[in-house]
Amino acid sequence: QRSLVGSEMCIRDRNISVLFLWAMSAIAFDSPGKVSPKVINEEVWAAYDGFNSTFLDPGKCIYKTDSSFESAVDRHNGAAAIWCQPIYWDMAMNAYKLAEAQKDKARKKTMKALCDDIFAGNKAHYANFDFDDNNENTGWFIYDDIMWWTITLARAYELFGDREYLKLSEVSFARVWYGSDKVGDSGSYDKENGGMFWQWQPIRNPAPNKFGDGKMACINFPTVVAALTLYNNVPERRKQSSESTPKYQTKAQYLEKGREIYAWGVENLMDKKTGRIADSRHGNGSPAWKAHVYNQASFIGASVLLYKATGEKSYLDNAILAADYTFNTMSSEQKILPFERGIEQGIYTAIFAQYIAMLVYDCGQTQYIPYLERTINCGWANRDQTRNVCSGEYDKPLQPGMVVDSYSASGIPALMLLFPIF
């Protein structure tokens, strides 16, 4: 395996480090003010089981929009958003890794079956992962919807070694970067001015993207995460494709693409003094400086992956700056992660969990553990105890039986799976 760059900053054995980090967090929050009782290991699994019992359609093995639906029929009738489904698959893979770390063979087997079922269910529902199918119900019609899947498919390959996952991840990356002959779009990548466009329009018979069209953080930094995750997993000596729109890249090409898009993002979407990430920029206009947790998250993940690949400390510094902004400016006075009420925005904490874990575990930034623990304990204490389901407003009780969406409910179990006590 590739040697870890910057290893003096890294915690190599994640399984050993978890207990130490949580012990340190207990000391850090032995301070004035009310602190909820600590979550124990059994509750981690109760939270994840409660989430799945409430939101996973057992027949289709995809997730529902909210608890009011009996099943996940389609986009307009009970199925959670296409771009959020891979975040739920990430949670299942994290559950598998946790069971493995705990040497719980029975639960590990169950979680592996769940991971397989979620992939199969989503493949069946979403056009057999034909990324050139742009129907607006079960197809692909926004660039970032595809790229979130690119990332998780690459992670699934990294964990399980199934080559179908890698093939789909690379094909989807290429589809976003270069566009689709079938759909007729020109691709997300702006070869003239850099960065990634968010969408093609119209969805049917699209016109080429032009200067001034939106370049959102939610496509740019996930593109970096995808490129670097693929960089970590494709063969070392792969030959460069001779096709004008190749279906795969070499390791060097993935790294180059990741570095290029990241550099564009830093120049156009990052406040270098504070670590705030803008939501978007259109042409030479001022960035839209509304900060969202998932944009902070994907920027942190992109920064960590580039730091590990190159050893360049500026990437790590950027990740820390963005994390500090999330906790010190965006979060509550108690450093509890914020909740946003927009459509699907409840998923932001689950995305943040994935990437702050990389900063904590891979780069030894343990200072964030107490704040994550505070969010977990607060959210779990306010759960609906009949279903073991949490809401996204972590400091407010969720009443028994109240309708709650899967996006908002995902945050606490996602954090618990990555920051458990065992």
Where are these regions (language model features)?
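Sec-dependent signal peptide recognition
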Residues: 12-22
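Aromatic- and glycine-enriched pocket-lining scaffold segments that form the walls
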Residues: 166-260, 264
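Noncatalytic carbohydrate-binding groove/subsite architecture in carbohydrate-active enzymes
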Residues: 221-222, 226-290, 297, 302-305, ...
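Bacterial Sec-dependent signal peptides at the C-terminal "C-region" and cleavage site
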Residues: 23-34
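Single conserved hydrophobic/aromatic residue that forms the stacking wall/gate
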Residues: 1-13
